[in-house]
Design a protein with these regions (language model features):
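Acidic (Asp/Glu)-rich catalytic clusters
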Residues: 2-6, 26-32, 51-74, 100-110
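Active-site acidic/histidine proton-transfer and metal-coordination neighborhood
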Residues: 23, 62-66, 82-128
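Glycine-rich, proline-tolerant flexible connector loops at the mouths of alpha/beta enzymes
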Residues: 38-65, 118-125
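Short beta->alpha connector loops
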Residues: 16-20, 43
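Hydrophobic faces of well-ordered beta-strands that scaffold small-molecule active sites
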Residues: 8-15, 35-39, 68-75, 114-116
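Residue-level recognition of alpha-helix initiation/capping sites
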Residues: 19-20, 53-54, 97
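Aromatic-lined carbohydrate-binding surfaces of glycoside hydrolases
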Residues: 77-81
């Protein structure tokens, strides 16, 4: 029985470019033949609160200039100040607002998915 293999797409995750201008990641993705960008949502490129305040115009410009879609947004949220697995109820609620903003931003540039991972609750916290 012949099995068909789904077409593979390769994305460039921008976290490794955090010490470079974001445009460098888009330029490299285009130059090296990547299919899409997985945009890391941390400083200095795509931090959720900054994008909420400034808008997504710069990212839209890069998408258009390099014809390189953002197919996944990965907001930074496993460290201070946002980690929904640690802290008190206030921190949890604040983290939820942050992640809701991230979902809205993901939709703003048409990315079909947002990736986030479970944070760490800490070794001394009682979670029973």
């Amino acid at each position: 029985m012949e099995r068909k293999v789904a077409e593979l797409e390769l994305g460039l995750f921008t976290s490794g470019y955090q010490r470079y201008p974001l445009e460098q990641a888009f330029e490299d993705a285009s130059r090296f033949g990547y299919d899409y960008i997985e945009l890391w949502g941390g400083y200095p490129h795509a931090y959720v609160e900054d994008l909420t305040a400034r808008g997504v115009g710069e990212i839209d410009r890069l998408i258009q200039k390099y014809r390189m879609p953002v197919k996944c947004f990965t907001p930074e949220h496993n460290g201070y100040p946002f980690n929904y697995m640690a802290g008190d109820e206030f921190q949890w609620e604040r983290s939820m607002v942050y992640l809701e903003k991230a979902i809205e931003l993901t939709a703003a540039w048409g990315a079909p998915m947002m990736l986030f991972s479970a944070g760490h609750a800490g070794v001394s916290d009682d979670r029973t």
